[in-house]
Amino acid sequence: MTLLGTALRPAATRVMLLGAGELGKEVAIECQRLGIEVIAVDRYPDAPAMHVAHRSHVINMLDSEALRHVITEEKPHYIVPEIEAIATDTLRELEGEGLNVVPCARATQLTMNREGIRRLAAEELGLPTSTYRFADSEASFHDAVAAVGFPCIVKPVMSSSGKGQSFIRSAEQLAQAWEYAQQGGRAGAGRVIVEGVVKFDFEITLLTVSAVDGVHFCAPVGHRQQDGDYRESWQPQQMSELALKRAQEIARHVVLALGGHGLFGVELFVCGDEVIFSEVSPRPHDTGMVTLISQDLSEFALHVRAFLGMPVGAIRQYGPAASAVILPQLTSQNVTFDNVHAAVGAGVQVRLFGKPEIDGTRRLGVALATGENVEEAVIRAKKAASRVTVKG
């Protein structure tokens, strides 16, 4: 049985978000719907989830001492990581002391870098993956590329949104790719993974919920990537029954091996009936923002329901839907959005994240749309996103 207290009262149930971006903001809103007290933590002030939290803190979450201090001060009942760049050793220690880390500290530690989760998937679970090698020096990087072959992809073992990633076609690109990978890691320079290129028809995110009443799957989410980050996503992605069954089997193995309750974003390559594991995030996924319009329970609502120990029951998918990012390029600490009235309409919504500033290219919002089919939904979402004019 789940007992929930009322926010700001002595018996309050407290949730601390480690990472307060747009995904954390939606988790915070779902917690607010249940009267939960929300504490948002990030490395910069006025992050999106801080706008809808009861309190907020600005710290370097890779600093073990600072992380322990804020958790000890706030005494949350649930610690909910939104990003990878966290001192996960400290989370394991705190979990050992009785704190509840979502979905569990082991999952956050294994998935904070690509090495932990790749070794779990390929070497422990025996799941199909791309060929890969790890390297921690430029010399071993050259050896790894030689072993994997061209073309290949290099990524920092700890990065997100395409930072530090390069597609390598020839030896002439190696020096530049190594340097870029060293600059792009979330925790600074360090180890990289070199992956062989997988031939696939499309990529999916299989949003998978591990809850008290078992493992549940959302309809597969298709997406288009550019520069290592998603541009559009849609649901449902059409695929064969056999491929879907295999995708669900892989996702089930991964989330049960990681442990804990919550929603996981399992990324997979699909080629015909074959399915290859790519990555997993033990939290809501950016491509899953489409579920804000496509399902009765969004990925954020499912995450909260699961980690609070509530049954999921069933997930209702309404029909074809899509999301398209609002991705301007400018420099400003006073961003405004014009022409929003022309973007919204029947079956079309806009979410603006409330990020405090932009310096270059940054995702500041998302358009959501339904349609008679996925193709129409994508067109409607992209058109809506393009109509929003970002100024600063």
UniProtKB/Swiss-Prot annotation:
- Enzyme class comes to ligase
Q: Which UniProt keywords are listed?
A: ATP-binding, Ligase, Magnesium, Metal-binding, Nucleotide-binding, Purine biosynthesis
Record's Gene Ontology CC terms?
cytosol
**Any one GO molecular-function label of the UniProt entry:** phosphoribosylglycinamide formyltransferase activity
One GO biological process from the UniProt record?
'de novo' IMP biosynthetic process
What Pfam family is a match, any one? PurT_C
User: Which residues make up the binding site for ATP?
Assistant: 114, 155, 160-165, 195-198, 203
Report the pathway entry.
Purine metabolism; IMP biosynthesis via de novo pathway; N(2)-formyl-N(1)-(5-phospho-D-ribosyl)glycinamide from N(1)-(5-phospho-D-ribosyl)glycinamide (formate route): step 1/1
Which reactions is this enzyme annotated as catalysing?
A: N(1)-(5-phospho-beta-D-ribosyl)glycinamide + formate + ATP = N(2)-formyl-N(1)-(5-phospho-beta-D-ribosyl)glycinamide + ADP + phosphate + H(+)
**Protein EC:** 6.3.1.21
InterPro entries tied to this protein: ATP-grasp (IPR011761), ATP-grasp_carboxylate-amine (IPR003135), ATP_grasp_subdomain_1 (IPR013815), PreATP-grasp_dom_sf (IPR016185), PurT (IPR005862), PurT/PurK_preATP-grasp (IPR054350), PurT_C (IPR048740), Rudment_hybrid_motif (IPR011054)
Q: Which domain of life is it from?
A: Bacteria
Residue numbers binding N(1)-(5-phospho-beta-D-ribosyl)glycinamide: 22-23, 82, 286, 355, 362-363
Q: Which residues bind Mg(2+)?
A: 267, 279
Q: Which residues form the ATP-grasp domain?
A: 119-308
| Record text on subunit structure and interactions | Homodimer.
* Purpose: Involved in the de novo purine biosynthesis. Catalyzes the transfer of formate to 5-phospho-ribosyl-glycinamide (GAR), producing 5-phospho-ribosyl-N-formylglycinamide (FGAR). Formate is provided by PurU via hydrolysis of 10-formyl-tetrahydrofolate.
Would you identify the family this protein belongs to, as annotated?
A: Belongs to the PurK/PurT family.
Q: What is this protein called?
A: Formate-dependent phosphoribosylglycinamide formyltransferase
**Source species of the chain:** Salmonella schwarzengrund (strain CVM19633)
State the encoding gene. Answer: purT
